[in-house]
A protein has these predicted regions:
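Bacterial Sec-dependent N-terminal signal peptides
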Residues: 1-25
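An exposed, glycine/acidic-rich loop-and-rim segment of catalytic or binding clefts
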Residues: 19-377
Length: 377
């Protein structure tokens, strides 16, 4: 082999090596997601373009993995998840990456009144109802009705009386990648008045799945107010200013900066840190607007969130304790991830001052949120 050929081969091998090392080692095996749950088939689907790569399963309509580049161009998985359907089913925290419904967040004492009737829901979070109950949408197999390289559409029919909720509710969700964005679009229709509050519960760590604490991440939330809570994390019914409080994220600060006030600040104390709904600043209700920005200074990864929803729950991983082990073999330790759940406010069916979450027959529930990924050089 002459010198020129040797140089070309060396350069080619170097290029191939560099391209391979620009992506985190892939650990998902599709057969671990292909199973049968009560006669319904589950599977794993890939959405991909030149910017981001997303893996979705129809079990819980959930995000399993999301890869985006850091400042060096190295693709890393920024969503916590598991290697198999079996691992999702046995996880201590059952909500990883899933679509939450019929009602995201908490409903006080699992009760609400609607059109003269009182409805009782399963209690699964101390004395309250959380995330649609133990067999909420996160625990259901969704039907895939369309899928291609850039999007997937899934549907689920929640029967009248399921988890105590009234009405047959037909839900549709579309996950789509466009450039460096992942969008989630929700639709729902009912044949009887019912509360509906859908969201996605992805747990993020922009350094990579469970790569240390998220307390050094920089966070900005476009919210001048939040909804304070009682000891059970049920809203008190007030809209409170974030001014001069640990809840002021209008200018970016590290997530952990004010956590030393957890003893002195009653709201941080009640949440064990941040687990609160923020009232987003919007020009008009229902408009698509900027909600939050998160930056990991070490990797340079940045995530911007836009939503049509009026609120967003910021959860700082306060209840993670290492019980769950993720797809890369890493324990999900205390504050190893955060969630930013676009939503209507918690307990709205019992809070007349909050924006209504009641969907009536003939109406269409429709909302969309966008997650935009970039990196700082």
């Amino acid at each position: 082999m002459n010198i020129k050929k040797l140089i070309l081969v060396t350069l080619l091998l170097s290029f191939i090596y560099c391209e391979q090392t620009k992506k985190q080692k892939f650990v998902l095996e599709i057969n671990n997601f292909q199973t049968d749950i009560e006669g319904k088939k589950t599977d794993l689907y890939q959405l991909k373009n030149e910017k981001i790569e997303v893996y979705i399963t129809n079990y819980g309509a959930r995000i399993v993995s999301l890869l985006s580049p850091d400042r060096e161009g190295i693709m890393g998985d920024v969503v916590l998840g598991f290697k198999s359907i079996a691992d999702y089913q046995k996880a201590k925290t059952p909500y990883h990456g899933c679509l939450i419904g019929r009602y995201g967040n908490r409903i006080a004492k699992g009760k609400f009144k609607l059109n003269g009737a009182t409805y009782e829901l399963p209690i699964n979070n101390n004395e309250n109802h959380l995330h649609g109950g133990p067999d909420g949408f996160h625990n259901q197999v969704w039907e895939v009705i369309a899928v291609n390289q850039n999007s997937i559409v899934m549907t689920y029919v929640s029967k009248d009386g399921e988890m105590g909720y009234p009405g047959n509710l037909t839900v549709e969700v579309t996950y789509a990648v466009n450039g460096n964005e992942l969008s989630i679009a929700y639709k729902a229709k009912t044949d009887k008045a019912t509360p509906v509050n859908l969201t996605n519960h992805a747990f993020f760590n922009l350094a990579g799945e469970a790569k240390g604490s998220i307390n050094d991440h920089l966070l900005m939330i476009n919210a001048s107010h939040f909804t304070p809570v009682d000891e059970g994390l049920i809203p008190l019914g007030e809209i409170q200013s974030v001014e001069d409080s640990p809840f002021d994220f209008r200018r970016a600060k590290t997530i952990g900066r004010d956590l030393n006030q957890q003893v002195s600040d009653i709201q941080l104390s009640r949440g064990g840190g941040y687990d609160h709904n923020f009232v987003l600043d919007k020009e008009s209700q229902g408009s698509m607007s900027f909600a939050a920005r998160v930056v990991d200074p070490k990797s340079g990864r940045q995530m911007d969130i836009f939503t049509e929803e009026p609120g967003m729950q910021f959860y700082g991983g306060n209840f993670m304790d290492g019980s769950d082990v993720g797809k890369y073999g890493t324990k999900f330790e205390y504050r190893a991830s955060f969630a930013l759940e676009t939503q209507h406010y918690p307990d709205s069916p019992n809070q007349p001052k909050f924006p209504s979450t009641i969907l009536n027959p003939g109406e269409t529930y429709q909302t969309k949120s966008i997650y935009k990924f970039s990196n700082s050089k």
